[in-house]
Regions:
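Conserved anchor residues at repeat-unit boundaries in beta-strand-based tandem repeats, strongest
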Residues: 8-18, 32-43, 56-66, 80-91, ...
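Beta-turn initiation residues at beta-strand->coil junctions
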Residues: 1-3, 23-27, 47-51, 71-75, ...
């Protein structure tokens, strides 16, 4: 009980601290956490709830923070993230979802940001990008795809932009350009090809 006489915790105790299965409440009486405890900290499997009683997180806890496999929700049972957690942050393999439940991203995370290899999806369900990420942005080798699933670009990205060596493809899959890029623009040494992928121009681009 709090000083005001409202219930703040109900469940098992050991050495005067929450231990085992128990429920934590907000001051207004709304349930905040339901699950396992160890030495006064959320530890094991549990659920957290928002001020309106909506489910916010369901999964593993360690020393009071989400840890291991878990699911994060937004709104009324709308799944936002599903995957690995470490010390309260998205860390490891995971999936992000659009509000309608369709997959938005599948890949690696570090400290809540996309980091490592991952796939980004359109709302239609087709893959938009597959490749390397750093600090939440496309960074390193990667491939862009058009809505038909054909490769549109393959090359190097820097901070979310095409930058470095890269190849651009037509919608029919044939190679159009191969060469250097700078911040999304063809820049430097490059070559243009016709639909039969025969060289038609080579030189500098600005």
């Amino acid at each position: 009980l709090s000083k005001e006489g409202t219930l703040v915790y109900q469940g098992g105790f050991e050495s005067g601290k929450p231990h085992g299965s128990g429920t934590e409440f907000r001051k207004d009486g709304q349930k905040f956490y339901q699950g396992n405890w160890q030495a006064g900290l959320k530890h094991g499997n549990g659920k957290t709830f928002g001020p309106k009683g909506n489910l916010m997180y369901e999964g593993g806890f360690q020393q009071g923070k989400p840890h291991g496999q878990g699911q994060e929700y937004r709104g009324e049972k709308v799944l936002f993230y599903q995957g690995e957690w470490k010390n309260g942050k998205k860390d490891g393999s995971g999936k992000l979802y659009f509000p309608d439940g369709k997959l938005a991203y599948e890949g690696q995370f570090v400290s809540n940001q996309r980091e490592g290899n991952g796939k980004e999806f359109r709302k239609s369900g087709t893959v938009y990008y597959e490749g390397s990420w750093q600090k939440g942005k496309k960074n390193g080798p990667g491939t862009l795809f058009n809505s038909d699933g054909q490769k549109a670009f393959s090359g190097v990205f820097v901070k979310g932009k095409r930058d470095g060596q890269g190849k651009e493809y037509r919608k029919d899959g044939s190679l159009y350009y191969a060469g250097e890029w700078r911040e999304e623009i063809k820049h430097g040494q490059g070559a243009i090809y016709n639909k039969k992928e025969q060289l038609v121009y080579t030189g500098q681009f600005r």
